[in-house]
């Protein structure tokens, strides 16, 4: 499996499960109190496109909202074979945050969508 990775953790490719796990561990160690919303954009056959926005802060307390799109391609076994994503990190004030649910659990089912939030 190949996964394209770009953004805050640097451009590059992670190939194979161990490399992807290591990449995600580095990402999540940097992006603290991470909260994510994705919306389906399009799908056909074994491909899905979503748009996303997530909020997080670094270890200095600086807040960010990261926006972008992801394209997913699944193999015949139903496993993700390719993931292409490009987040754009925007520095925000803590008072401009829109995601306030407890990040130790999933986003509440009644939480506003990206469209509802104007994102």
Language-model features, listed with the residues they occupy:
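Short hydrophobic/aromatic-rich beta-strand segments that constitute the beta-sheet cores
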Residues: 7-8, 50, 80-83
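Short coil/turn motifs at secondary-structure junctions
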Residues: 57-59, 74-77, 88-90
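Low-complexity, intrinsically disordered terminal/linker segments enriched in charged
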Residues: 84-119
């Amino acid at each position: 499996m190949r996964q394209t990775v770009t953004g805050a953790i640097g451009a590059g490719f992670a190939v194979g499960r161990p490399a992807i796990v290591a990449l995600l561990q580095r990402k999540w160690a940097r992006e603290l109190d991470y909260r994510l919303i994705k919306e389906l954009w399009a799908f056909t056959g074994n491909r899905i496109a979503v748009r996303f926005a997530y909020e997080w802060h670094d270890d200095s307390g600086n807040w960010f909202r990261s926006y972008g799109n992801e394209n997913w391609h699944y193999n015949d076994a139903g496993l993700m074979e390719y993931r292409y994503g490009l987040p754009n990190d925007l520095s925000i004030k803590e008072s401009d945050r829109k995601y306030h649910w407890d990040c130790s659990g999933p986003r509440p089912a009644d939480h506003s969508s990206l469209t509802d939030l104007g994102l």
